Amino acid sequence: LDEVELVYEMPVTISGDTLVYNADSFNTGTERKLEDVLKNLPGVEINDDGQVEVEGKVVNKLMVEGKDFFDGDTKLATKNIPSNAVDKVQVLKNYSEVSQLGGVTNNQDNIAINIKLKEGKKNFWFGNITAGAGDSKANSLYLVQPKLFYYSPEYSVNFIGDINNIGEVAFSRRDYFNFSGGFQSPSRSSGTNLSLGNNDIGFLLLQNNRAKDINTKFGAANFSWSPKKTLDIGGFAIFSNSKNELQENRSVQYTVAPAGLADEDTQSNTSQNNDLGMLKLTTKYQPNANNQLEYEALGNLSKSTQDQRFNSSLNGSIDQLETTNPYSFNQSLNYYYTLNETNIFAFEAQHLIKDEDPFYNAILEDKANYEGTANSLGLDGAQLDYNLGQEKRVQSNQLDAKLDYWNILNKKSNINLTLGTILSHQQFDSHIFQFLDNQTEVRPTPVIANGAATNDIAYNFSDMYLGVHYRLKSGKFTFTPGVSAHAYAISNRQTGVKTTDNFFRFLPDMNVIFQIKKSETLNLNYRMQTQFTDVSQFASGLVLNNYNSLFSGSPDLQSALSHNVNLSYYSFNMFNYTNVFANINYNKSIDNVRTVSQFVPGSVIRVSTPFNSNFADESLSANGRFQRTFGKLRASVRANLNYSKFNQFIQDRPSVNESFSQTYRAQLRTNFRTAPNVDLSYRYSIQDNNLGPNSTKFFTKSPSIEVDALILKSFTFKTDYSYNDFSDEDRTINTYEFWNASLSYRKDEDAKFEYEIRATNLLDTRSQNQSSASNISVSATEYFIQPRYVTFRVRYEL
């Protein structure tokens, strides 16, 4: 015997800004999807929304073998890619999609993940198909989930399907509106923040992907094709249909309400139907290292209906119907050119077309309690009930473009010049009408808002800007000071009157990076921004936000100015897997757009009007996590603190609203190969609100435990339990528990079939609670959820 050579693959390796995790070094055998793999990795988290977080930052790009996987969101990947296909997980910090710009731009907030597949999964179809069934008191349960993947150097094809009525949400309405498709605004760092608004009226969102009843149909396909080395073509298509039943009981405490009125208790039963569609196409042409041309197009189309039966202790029974069929088309053209070693050019342009048409209808049976509002709106009182409606349409057309030039002075410094523009046009039309008993429709004449129940307004925005930034590396520090000069031109035309606002402004910014060690960084960022609101805030005619909230805009609104300071710290020790991040953010807004609210005499129905506040609004947030591995144990503590203070006027009286939320979490997790693994967690939340003369404080205590075990190498047992105590300063308002469990069998890890029995909500909990605050009220909500479901499933592995 001459020698013994021990070959060992490091669980984690660091190369520059890239962390590479060897998945099998952390897997325990109970993993079934990418989400399970990522949860095992130190420094990587899956948040409550199902998104991947690294260094406390949400990861928006996930690739497989370097190819985009439904660009713009990581949830589809984590919930669907099978765990047995994952070889390596590469975390790419300071990620730049354009290699030519990697050395001249700061990308500290850009983190991407690339999944490397195992050799047996390349050039072959892989994935699984799951089918399941069960029974409940209400109806029969079903589940079909095909997930198919193919990867080769030339092309890739992925298909994900999901049809179920057991509440497993593949793609929610919230996911749809948060799905960026990978688009980033060229002016995102210019200092201008322009809102196009969100013109949904009041569609309810699922809480923690739970509701009283959820039916889902989902299909998505993603592809990439490289016909030659210089050309890449890709895209995806997504369709989702969901039918949801929601039930809520809410107690509302108003900040300032007319004398003699009690707080409000409401009950609502809501039916929703959502059809959501999305289509994206991308092309990238790179003939050589000095040229790169990109074109992307993303189309969104949806059709949503919400029918709500609402009962108020103050306003009686109300039937509300809301529908909307919006669409948008976004396209971008980017070209990057490297002239030589010291001169780089980049052109980015993005064009957005958006059309929204929300419709609202409310039928109020209790006429007496709505009399004051009806008189203000000019409604006809000689009817059986008040049946009012509103049609609204908002059309947006925006061009966002810029030209960048970098001059590399030496190895440690460069100068960046930016010439850009934002051109935006919005058209806003709305009218309020009343349905009479004889089936005719009339348009009322209000006695408020100058007698206008209609809007026809054109809003134009223009920003021409020139920016300069200097980047210098000095030792462990990187300094990037800069300033941009903006020429703004804003106008709105309504009722034959044109209102303009033209001004010039300098906006400075500064970024300092302190690279303490190879894997330890301190980052300071300051930015001054000009904030502009959308067209709806300028429309002076009355608008129904809902039956109890009327709105009248102001044509004379001006922009707001904000100062933002952010300090972040990150450290990773690959020897004991100590992971630390901390982030502090402070924001101060001057001349911010706030509302003055007037309650209709004798009711809690109010009319709000925006104005530029003379008082500064402030917010301060801090969050951090410390995580360390001790052998087979991984411990972590995390805190999130958010404080905000803003000013408004209610009943002609100034009101200072303060909110302070705190969430603390401690977690202990094991990582055994053969023994069962346990994840213990305790979450403690405080929601403290001071709204004018009123103050409320709510507490939530949530211990939880998760157990997963591989038994006899064939059985996988998983269970999770959480207990929630929701209280105020005087009493416990509600306690609720959730317990889920599953037991699956497969002959071995290479078996084609796996059989599983799964139970959700074993304790048959019927509701959960949460608190929330708005600018005029604080509310505590009881939210009803699905009952106990037990299903049997069969999974076939390709």
Indicate where each model-derived feature is located:
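Conserved small-residue
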Residues: N585, S589-E618
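Face-selective signature of the C-terminal outer-membrane beta-barrel domain
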Residues: K229-S240, D275-T305, D319-T495, Y577-Y586, ...
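Extracytoplasmic loops and strand-loop junctions of Gram-negative outer membrane beta-barrel proteins
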Residues: D71-G72, F126-T130, I201-Q207, G260-Q267, ...
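Transmembrane beta-strand segments that form the barrel wall of outer-membrane beta-barrel proteins
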Residues: F124-D135, F159-G161, A485-A489, G553, ...
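Membrane-proximal, glycine/serine-rich, low-complexity loop/turn segments characteristic
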Residues: E3, E9-D307, Q320-F359, L403-S424, ...
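Outer-membrane beta-barrel translocator domains and adjoining extracellular loop/strand segments
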Residues: G102-G103, A170-Y176, L246-A262, Q306-L314, ...
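Conserved C-terminal beta-signal and adjacent last beta-strands/turns
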Residues: T663-Y684, T696-L798
